[in-house]
Amino acid sequence: MHLLIAAAGSGRRMGADRNKLLLPLAGKPVIAWTLKAALAAEHIQWIGVVGQEIDREPILDLVRDANKPVTWIQGGSTRQESVLRGLAGLPEAAEQVLIHDGARCLAEPALFDRCAMALASGQALIAATPVTDTIKRVDADGVITDTPDRSELWAAQTPQGFQVDQLRHGHAEAEANGWTVTDDASLYERLGWPVQVLDAGPSNIKVTTPFDLNVAEAVLALRQQD
């Protein structure tokens, strides 16, 4: 299976002056934990890291002794553009691809393998987790307008897996129609293509704020105790 890791993050919400993926977490950069899990996943054979040139050297330094191919791909100005460039950088033989946010550094090898095996059946999928909070829909004035049925709500995460040709077609449609999406599954929704959810468990958080870093540190400490 081919894996693209989106690594063109910023440190704005962290209050940092550099890519949040290079901030320290339990003695290593955040993205080092993401790469460690991906490299340990049995079903991942090739990894493409999509990022900005300024981060190329420090990120590639983390995988100098990798046990499988790791390729750098220059990212774009948005996540959507970066994924499109990542797709262009895949090996010609790639038929299926997993796309993962570098900031989801608590993803374990087993999650990558589960997603890879599920994708091998042909169905597009996303890692996700059932919503446990009561969600409110509000208007522009902050007034509640609706309470969606929680049993139907899942928080979308990554990895997300797709057939390469179909995902390329989806991005071509997005460019032609001026669509802006925050994840690739949204393209499939707009085009009426089915996407399955795969329960990722509670720990697959995205490190975005200083609080998230503290949570990730605690989770990693617990794992080391086990």
From Swiss-Prot:
Enzyme Commission number: 2.7.7.60
Function: Catalyzes the formation of 4-diphosphocytidyl-2-C-methyl-D-erythritol from CTP and 2-C-methyl-D-erythritol 4-phosphate (MEP).
Residues carrying the site annotation Positions MEP for the nucleophilic attack: R150, K206
Coiled-coil zones: none
Lineage summary: Bacteria, Bacillati, Cyanobacteriota, Cyanophyceae, Synechococcales
Pathway(s) served: Isoprenoid biosynthesis; isopentenyl diphosphate biosynthesis via DXP pathway; isopentenyl diphosphate from 1-deoxy-D-xylulose 5-phosphate: step 2/6
PANTHER family: 2-C-METHYL-D-ERYTHRITOL 4-PHOSPHATE CYTIDYLYLTRANSFERASE, CHLOROPLASTIC (PTHR32125:SF4)
Family: Belongs to the IspD/TarI cytidylyltransferase family. IspD subfamily.
InterPro entries reported for this sequence: IspD (IPR001228), IspD/TarI (IPR034683), IspD/TarI_cytidylyltransf_bact (IPR050088), ISPD_synthase_CS (IPR018294), Nucleotide-diphossugar_trans (IPR029044)
Molecular functions per Gene Ontology: 2-C-methyl-D-erythritol 4-phosphate cytidylyltransferase activity
Name of this chain's protein: 2-C-methyl-D-erythritol 4-phosphate cytidylyltransferase
GO biological process: isopentenyl diphosphate biosynthetic process, methylerythritol 4-phosphate pathway
Pfam families: IspD (PF01128)
Record-annotated site: Transition state stabilizer: R13, K20
Reaction(s) catalysed (UniProt annotation): 2-C-methyl-D-erythritol 4-phosphate + CTP + H(+) = 4-CDP-2-C-methyl-D-erythritol + diphosphate
Organism: Parasynechococcus marenigrum (strain WH8102)
Gene responsible for this protein: ispD
Domain of life according to the entry: Bacteria
Keywords: Isoprene biosynthesis, Nucleotidyltransferase, Transferase
